[in-house]
Amino acid sequence: MVEKRFQPLARDAMAYVLAGGRGSRLKELTDRRAKPAVYFGGKTRIIDFALSNALNSGIRRIGVATQYKAHSLIRHMQRGWNFFRPERNESFDILPASQRVSETQWYEGTADAVYQNIDIIEPYGPEYMVILAGDHIYKMDYEWMLQQHVDSGAEVTIGCLEVPRMEAVGFGVMHVDEKDQIIDFVEKPADPPGIPGNPDFALASMGIYVFHTKFLIECLKRDAADPNSSRDFGKDIIPYIVKNGKAVAHRFAQSCVRSDFEREAYWRDVGTIDAYWQANIDLTAVVPELDIYDKSWPIWTYAEISPPAKFVHDDENRRGSAVSSVVAGDCIISGASLSNSLLFTGVRANSYSKLEGAVVLPSVKVGRHAQLKNVVIDHGVNIPEGLVVGEDPQLDAKRFRRTESGICLITQTMIDKLDI
């Protein structure tokens, strides 16, 4: 007799990724693209992490709601995520805001972005819905969260981070009992409630929710009928369930995918220029906190066909070299020196230039003798010869987008305005 195989809950789930946000704190980086479409890690886009987590967890039905400046994001997903097959009971739906409910109504909130596509979700018949934010960097096996959701009998299970209590003021925070059932949900509290038994820490919402599909649809329809609702999961749906039903917290540490379990669970909201720069530069460490080399949990993406990176010239003061750096394919380091930098595809760094602490997006050209320190350079920028950034804070702030910590964002528009 053949033993019955265990059927993972993920096979009965649909992941729904909310990817319509701008990410305004990234300033000019999101002038032409939505935050989930922003480049990250030398090869991928931010959204690839949520999508890869779903795929690696065993989820084979995915929907992605888009809205703000979605062309770059949609094109990326069409190229890199087109391998789902209906004949294998797989689906990948890109769901731009398209006034499906009303001729005057776009997506009015995160909950509305799901509500307007109920007629697309229902025919697939998923037992569970995994609602995800498309703009965070982390690796997570959603199967563990699904299992806790079923075992606990919860109506919603919310992914949570354990963070120092006073750092939780910018999050939605869960007040839980000893069994992690949520007693109260507070949005950005001045005095966050601590965790039972660990009062110096609080449980902050990751914007990840698991529902039984039938229950979720009931909640969305009720919310849509409420004229006072803001149509948002964090502001409306979750507080209602916490007050009137059963909501449970799932601790991220229980499902975080990591190659070394002695290390802290890695999750980053790269929503500011400083955070974005730091998360990319972190990858240049000898052993980075985020393991992007783990073949058991790959980060899937659209990979261009490109030649390998090349380093040329070995003369005095003109040596193509890189130390503690990540360099993508099709880069040519022609007599330039790199340290603690991350370069995306197709970067050209010309002779005598020096990059230190640089995050360089695709197709950038760095002119001779340029000296660039602690910068983020947007896609396609041509850095003129001899440009110096990172030595004169006042001049940098006048020319570029400079943060309080000294990171400079450089775009082509800023370069075009230079009087050099």
Swiss-Prot record:
Q: Name one GO biological process term.
A: glycogen biosynthetic process
Give an example GO molecular function: ATP binding
Which residue pairs form cystines in this protein?
Answer: none
Pfam families noted in UniProt = Hexapep_GlmU (PF24894), NTP_transferase (PF00483)
Q: Name the catalysed reactions.
A: alpha-D-glucose 1-phosphate + ATP + H(+) = ADP-alpha-D-glucose + diphosphate
Q: Which InterPro entries does the UniProt entry name for this protein?
A: ADP-Glc_PPase (IPR011831), ADP_Glu_pyroP_CS (IPR005836), GlgC_bac (IPR023049), GlmU/GlgC-like_hexapep (IPR056818), NTP_transferase_dom (IPR005835), Nucleotide-diphossugar_trans (IPR029044), Trimer_LpxA-like_sf (IPR011004)
* Keyword field: ATP-binding, Carbohydrate metabolism, Glycogen biosynthesis, Glycogen metabolism, Nucleotide-binding, Nucleotidyltransferase, Transferase
Q: In which pathway does it act?
A: Glycan biosynthesis; glycogen biosynthesis
Instruction: List its EC numbers.
Output: 2.7.7.27
- Residues noted as binding alpha-D-glucose 1-phosphate in the record, renumbered to the chain: 107, 172, 187-188, 205
Superkingdom, natural source: Bacteria
Coiled-coil-forming residues are none
Kindly indicate whether the keyword ATP-binding belongs to this entry: yes
Query: Family per UniProt?
Result: Belongs to the bacterial/plant glucose-1-phosphate adenylyltransferase family.
Per UniProt, subunit arrangement is: Homotetramer.
Function per UniProt:
Involved in the biosynthesis of ADP-glucose, a building block required for the elongation reactions to produce glycogen. Catalyzes the reaction between ATP and alpha-D-glucose 1-phosphate (G1P) to produce pyrophosphate and ADP-Glc.
| Protein name, per record | Glucose-1-phosphate adenylyltransferase
Organism of derivation: Rhizobium rhizogenes (strain K84 / ATCC BAA-868)
Q: Gene for this protein?
A: glgC
